[in-house]
Amino acid sequence: IGFWLESDRMLCLDFSSKSLEVQRGVVMEEFKQRCLNRPYGDTGHLLRPLVYKEHPYQWPTIGKELNHIAQATLQEVEDFFFSFYAPNNAILAVTGNITFEEAVRLAEKWFGPIPRRELKKRNLPAEPQQTEERRLTVERNVPIESLYMAFRMCDRMHPDYYAYDILSDILSNGRSSRLIQHLVHDRQIFSRSAPNPPFRAVP
């Protein structure tokens, strides 16, 4: 049923004002719940513009502001869909009690008839090298103060990416990590430390 659902969505998604309003309401509620109505929920919205000045990564996937979702038009949604949602621009992940051969057969059955689409070439601006510290102090009604720091690292295709990933674990993932031991247990100036190495296409 998963093959049928996803292929149906890719082939003949229902573009109508009614369906747009339903989905708009769902996404706006998700935005409020995740980003506006819980402590530290807007951290990503505040941190991204400090890290990225040119690249679109400065905008969260769910939207930068609530009115961006509220003002999205049906034509914009349709244009975006047909620009990126195509079998020649998709990755299919299949899990469960199924063989490789059966997965290929079902993929060809359900996605094979869907025509390829001419994809727009993405010409994204390069993020310039950061040469100075960027800092933002925000006052919020939250349980405790928090400090978020971001450092430039290589992109996910760089051969050093996995070394950075392991290094982040050594530094701050788990009770025996360096930062947990030094800042949480020994000096007791933080209550926790959590790494989050990004899996992104640009540094």
Model-derived features: positions:
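Charge-rich, well-structured scaffold segments of protease-associated domains
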Residues: 1-119, 137, 155, 163, ...
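His/Glu-based metal-binding/catalytic segments typifying zinc-dependent metallopeptidases
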Residues: 32, 49, 119-176
